């Protein structure tokens, strides 16, 4: 978990997190009540705008702060026991412990390599650059995304004096060094009087959907199930929605006095797999649409999106979809 990476959590997922996992300290998250989307084809003109006067749209949290809080709360929980697994651990030794269910989130261990290699995947040939801007104090509750010729850049507030940056840059035809990225951040800066730009980190971008969610009593989970482009801020939200469904299935089985076995995992796959695939493909379609738009010289596509954004019913639908996913 990089110190300059952040995640966005939708309002409904945030409420679930506080109720079922742990209370996130008010010092660790920042409220976002407005989202503005631009394209550099229509200079300084808002392409799409999402806001809810009654509620926050989502919350921004630093990855490392969330991980630190999660570890602290797990240690205090009577339901949690930390085990250090040996390097030579294998499936046979796990079976001897007779676990009802095994949930695997590690894409690099022996379980993943044996059972969870078949997936539908796509390489975006993008590098996501992340950093944090230190800037002059302003009212800072609006997230901004700009679709540039190099790729989408998101400005995600984390306080009145700090804003997280995620710049997904197309590197298929051109490579960028850190000074290029910093120049482009400054060029696309929507409103901030920048005092300092922290060290840049980067990671490759791809999307994937696992073909089979479980084998026997072993469930793949998290990024193993699905990875999506970060432009919509939905990766972690998809995982929390999966968690909500899995917890509900397990709670229902326990309440009925039923055994926790592979039937739990089968029900989970049936309730989530198709929806996750459709949702991830929708995010991919958004990326490819803007990717196509930047290659076309006229502004017609951008103007069509602007007209769609001005439709109140569609606007509200997209807000709900980003909050709760596909129901």
Residue ranges and their predicted role:
Residues 29-130:
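Conserved N-terminal helical subregion
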Residues 8-11, 51-72, 172-179, 205, ...:
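Short beta-strand to alpha-helix junction loop
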């Amino acid at each position: 978990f990089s110190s300059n990476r952040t995640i966005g959590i939708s309002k409904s997922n945030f409420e679930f997190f506080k109720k079922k996992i742990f209370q996130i300290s008010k010092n660790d998250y920042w409220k976002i009540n407005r989202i503005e989307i631009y394209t550099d084809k229509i200079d300084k003109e808002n392409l799409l705008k999402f806001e809810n006067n009654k509620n926050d749209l989502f919350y921004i949290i630093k990855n490392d702060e969330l991980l630190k809080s999660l570890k602290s709360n797990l240690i205090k929980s009577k339901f949690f026991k930390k085990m250090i697994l040996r390097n030579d651990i294998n499936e046979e030794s796990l079976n001897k412990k007779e676990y009802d269910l095994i949930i695997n989130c590690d894409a690099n261990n022996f379980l993943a390599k044996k059972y969870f290699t078949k997936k539908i995947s796509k390489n975006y040939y993008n590098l996501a650059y992340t950093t944090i801007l230190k800037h002059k104090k302003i009212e800072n509750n609006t997230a901004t995304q700009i679709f540039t010729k190099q790729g989408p850049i998101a400005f995600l507030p984390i306080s009145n004096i700090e804003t997280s940056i995620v710049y997904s840059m197309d590197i298929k035809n051109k490579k960028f060094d850190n000074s290029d990225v910093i120049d482009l951040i400054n060029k696309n800066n929507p409103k901030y009087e920048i005092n300092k730009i922290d060290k840049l980190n980067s990671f490759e971008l791809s999307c994937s959907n696992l073909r089979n969610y479980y084998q026997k009593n072993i469930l793949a989970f998290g990024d193993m199930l699905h990875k999506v482009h970060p432009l919509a801020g939905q990766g972690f939200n998809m995982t929390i929605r999966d968690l909500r469904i899995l917890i509900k299935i397990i709670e229902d089985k326990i309440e009925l006095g039923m055994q926790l076995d592979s039937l739990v995992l089968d029900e989970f796959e049936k309730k989530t797999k198709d929806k996750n695939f459709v949702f991830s493909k929708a995010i991919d379609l958004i990326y490819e649409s803007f990717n196509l738009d930047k290659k076309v010289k006229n502004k017609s596509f951008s103007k069509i999106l602007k007209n769609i954004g001005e439709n109140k019913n569609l606007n509200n639908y997209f807000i709900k979809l980003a909050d709760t996913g596909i129901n």
